[in-house]
């Protein structure tokens, strides 16, 4: 089972200079609750951003895979050079956690989308390429002020 998890605003904005364009504790708590201790896949920029955020603390994931076209020896992660081959052949639960290129490369292979819809419009420079969410089935939805947590099944 492959999951992808991200937050986006009304314009499908997901980032600003390699960080989130917002700081909403409920969204951060949801992301942590969903991914903590899990096997994750992310791009190199996302990895470096998280390492900067957590500083000396270990990242809160089980197994960590980092997509990079270059061969890199990460101290706490395995390098993945061919993301598409990796997700097509990976047999266990996997959480795709960013960034944009990794989401878009893996989207055809993802079984469940966990999207936090951040109500409103924010400033940033990284937008998710639009796709038809209606091709997915909404299987779970929770609303709180300013956010909609939605899970979609392929």
Q: Which residue stretches match the model-derived regions?
A:
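Enzymes that bind and transform nitrogen-containing heteroaromatic metabolites
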Residues: 1-154
């Amino acid at each position: 089972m492959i999951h992808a998890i991200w937050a986006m605003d009304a314009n499908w904005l997901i980032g600003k200079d390699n960080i989130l364009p917002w700081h909403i504790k409920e969204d951060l708590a949801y992301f942590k609750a969903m991914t903590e201790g899990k096997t994750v896949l992310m791009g190199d920029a996302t990895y470096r951003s998280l390492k900067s955020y957590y500083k000396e603390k270990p990242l809160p994931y089980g197994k960590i895979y980092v997509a990079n076209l270059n061969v890199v020896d990460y101290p706490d992660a395995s390098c993945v050079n061919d993301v598409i081959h990796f997700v097509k052949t990976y047999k266990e639960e996997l959480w795709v956690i960013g960034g944009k290129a990794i989401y878009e490369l893996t989207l055809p292979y993802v079984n469940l989308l966990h999207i936090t819809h951040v109500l409103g419009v924010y400033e940033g420079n990284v937008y998710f390429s639009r796709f038809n969410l209606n091709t997915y089935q909404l299987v779970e939805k929770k609303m709180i002020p300013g956010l909609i947590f939605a899970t979609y099944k392929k």
